[in-house]
């Protein structure tokens, strides 16, 4: 669990009572760069995978902490209930296609390197 210095004490107590591990990374907000550095040192992590949806992914992209983007293209056009996966990113990101693979059921897997 990642928390900041300003995480409410009640929530920290909640984590401690349940014996959840947590790491304080950041003053007012969780500092994602600091969190990734911690993962590298403490857990010897060289790669991190996130598939939590657009919020965390967009934050990591926005802060320049992503070097590769994997996309699965499904053979379906979604109507009015769709949303822009990258809608919260304020700047254009340049990508270079590294891999493309056709999968079962018409899916296509695209792997891009972030180049900016």
Where are these regions (language model features)?
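Enzymes that bind and transform nitrogen-containing heteroaromatic metabolites
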Residues: 1-116
């Amino acid at each position: 669990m990642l928390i900041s210095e300003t995480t409410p004490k009640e929530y920290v107590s909640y984590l401690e009572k349940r014996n959840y591990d947590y790491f304080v990374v950041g003053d007012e907000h969780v500092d994602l760069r600091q969190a990734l550095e911690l993962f590298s040192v403490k857990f010897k992590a060289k790669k991190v995978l996130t598939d939590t949806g657009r919020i965390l992914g967009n934050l990591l992209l926005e802060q320049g902490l992503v070097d590769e983007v994997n996309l699965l293209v499904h053979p379906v056009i979604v109507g009015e209930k769709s949303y822009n996966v990258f809608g919260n990113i304020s700047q254009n990101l340049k990508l270079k296609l590294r891999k493309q693979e056709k999968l079962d059921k018409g899916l296509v897997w695209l792997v891009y390197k972030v180049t900016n």
